[in-house]
Amino acid sequence: MSKKKAEKKKGGFVRAIRNIFLFLIACALLILLGLTGIYIYVKHDVNPRLLKEEDATALSDVDCIIILGASVKNGDTPSPMLRDRLDEGIALYKAGCAPKILMSGDHGSEYYNEVSVMKNYAIKQGVPSEDIFLDHAGFSTYESMYRARAIFGAEKVVIVTQKYHLTRAVYNAKNLGMDAYGVAAAPINYGGQTIRNIREYLAISKDFVMTFIKPEPTVLGNPISLDGSGDVTNGAD
């Protein structure tokens, strides 16, 4: 092969690599644009439903306050993040926001039970046991909201979680058929928040799709009326 042909072949290879690189960059930018567009839409859609505590207590006919689970320590102690969610939800209950509390979290094994830890904490704070319902299969934000509507029959709810997570939670509930509002737990700076913010940015797009196609959650079950006693949910349903 002549030197001229070799240089031409090498030049063609370099151009091909460059074109592939530019194509991948263009795809990445389009994906980023799509994710950002969904993020902005969801934030704008839900923003009027994010309330201060005093505004939430002024709502009428709220079926329940939904407190979303988070990690527990040593099997029986709420993590700081979960404790702050519980404190806000309990404050709303005591202020008359709703007659019942629905605690939704992960009870995926006999060795890990977020919701029982949550209920025990609330009882120690003076909330009657019969006013606390447990959703043992709230394995994700989407599943918690799906089950709140499908299993517990909730129609109008106030959701409590941290501010960074609240938009997605309310969006899920709203698009699964509930009149949903949200109140953020106390704005504490927890370690690793930057990573959580990035995950939430991606999770908003995931749940945007989930609420469009509406797949059933991992676990369903028989209906449970919020008009009865929450003690019927003390065991896994």
Where are these regions (language model features)?
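Short linear elements at protein peripheries
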Residues: P217-D237
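A transmembrane-helix-recognition feature enriched in membrane-embedded lipid enzymes
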Residues: N197-V219
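N-terminal type II signal-anchor transmembrane helix
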Residues: K5-E54
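A structural signal for short, hydrophobic/glycine-enriched beta-strand patches
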Residues: G37-I198
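Coil-to-alpha-helix initiation sites in intrinsically disordered, low-complexity, charged segments
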Residues: E7-R15, N189, Q193-R196, E200
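N-terminal targeting leaders characterized by basic, low-complexity, disordered sequences
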Residues: M1-K3
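A general structural signal for short secondary-structure boundary/capping elements
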Residues: G108-E114, Y181-A184, A203-M210, L226-V232
